Amino acid sequence: MPKPSVGINGFGRIGRLVLRAAVEKDSVNVVAVNDPFISIDYMVYLFQYDSTHGRFKGTVAHEGDYLLVAKEGKSQHKIKVYNSRDPAEIQWGASGADYVVESTGVFTTIEKANAHLKGGAKKVIISAPSADAPMFVVGVNHEKYDHANDHIISNASCTTNCLAPLAKVINDNFGIIEGLMTTVHAVTATQKTVDGPSGKLWRDGRGAGQNIIPASTGAAKAVGKVIPELNGKLTGMAFRVPTPDVSVVDLTARLEKPASLDDIKKVIKAAADGPMKGILAYTEDQVVSTDFVSDTNSSIFDAGASISLNPHFVKLVSWYDNEFGYSNRVVDLISYIATKA
């Protein structure tokens, strides 16, 4: 089977890291990129140099209106570059892009993302939560994808991708009565470097580098969409903290069946070594956030940081590289849906 041909709309943090993940995994072929705000020579620079994940360990250049990305031992990607503001005008079909990653953060509904289909794309994967597109978390509910009807789908959020695999393992083994999630979350591009206006969410406009900022997140409620039996049982919030990358989920849950912390560790380790390998990982090391920069897993359970009050009430801690782990799942989701074409 030929590799799926992919287009990327929006060459920001996620767009660029999806391309890095595509090069590394060598499982999809990126054939087009669109970004109205970045010239092709600037794309080369932004892709080559990354303050968080380091310099790209390969070659990147441009020839005419094509980006040329290569890495030793991997396939070369010859990528047509577009600079269109209107997604309906991007000629995805002409460049052969069947699957479009919508990573601008702007076109996150079925109606808005549908514009990509007009340019010849067959499927759109939104790299953000969506109000109405079906959400899939690889390793949790990706097998519910329906090729005949699901043309615009969401890869959910980075936090949902961390929480859902953990919640699935716990719920499958012990049952979750209810739970509260907190994510201690790295800064993202929407935050301000210094205090500034921020619409209705005044706290969000405070300086990202000097504050711990309480914020809302739909990530926990979204788990109820990908694991229907947990619908209405989870909610959560976020603290934005002054670190550039890597976040951590704290899930505090009440369990139906009694379980010791050792019982919980055993089932998570079994899932991490077995059916969820590459999605969920397990560590007993004395780790901190920077140890997970560029980690490709969705969720890394921290056995040493997790605690139990009693056999029915536990606090479970799981790390995630909110940029790179997530970008790898975008590529995995495309690889999976391509097998259903």
Swiss-Prot record:
Binding site residues for D-glyceraldehyde 3-phosphate: 157-159, 188, 217-218, 240
GO annotation, biological process: glucose metabolic process; glycolytic process
Main subcellular localisation: cytoplasm
SUPFAM superfamilies with a match to the protein in the record: Glyceraldehyde-3-phosphate dehydrogenase-like, C-terminal domain, NAD(P)-binding Rossmann-fold domains
EC number: 1.2.1.12
The reaction(s) this protein catalyses: D-glyceraldehyde 3-phosphate + phosphate + NAD(+) = (2R)-3-phospho-glyceroyl phosphate + NADH + H(+)
Site (Activates thiol group during catalysis): 185
Top-level division of the source organism's lineage: Eukaryota
InterPro entries the record matches: GlycerAld/Erythrose_P_DH, GlycerAld_3-P_DH_AS, GlycerAld_3-P_DH_cat, GlycerAld_3-P_DH_NAD(P)-bd, Glyceraldehyde-3-P_DH_1, NAD(P)-bd_dom_sf
Positions of the catalytic residues: 158
Pfam families from the UniProt entry: Gp_dh_C, Gp_dh_N
CDD domains with a match to the protein in the record: GAPDH_I_C (cd18126), GAPDH_I_N (cd05214)
Keywords, alphabetical: Cytoplasm, Glycolysis, NAD, Oxidoreductase
Protein location: Cytoplasm
Cellular component aspect of the GO annotation: cytosol
Pathway: Carbohydrate degradation; glycolysis; pyruvate from D-glyceraldehyde 3-phosphate: step 1/5
Gene3D superfamilies the UniProt entry points to: Dihydrodipicolinate Reductase, domain 2, NAD(P)-binding Rossmann-like Domain
Binding-site list for NAD(+): 13-14, 35, 85, 322
UniProt keyword annotation of Kinase present: no
Family as reported in the entry's similarity comment: Belongs to the glyceraldehyde-3-phosphate dehydrogenase family.
PANTHER family: GLYCERALDEHYDE 3-PHOSPHATE DEHYDROGENASE (PTHR10836), GLYCERALDEHYDE-3-PHOSPHATE DEHYDROGENASE-RELATED (PTHR10836:SF76)
Subunit annotation: Homotetramer.
Note: There are four nearly identical glyceraldehyde 3-phosphate dehydrogenases in Caenorhabditis elegans.
Protein name: Glyceraldehyde-3-phosphate dehydrogenase 2
Species this chain originates from: Caenorhabditis elegans
Lineage per the UniProt record: Eukaryota, Metazoa, Ecdysozoa, Nematoda, Chromadorea
Gene that this polypeptide is encoded by: gpd-2
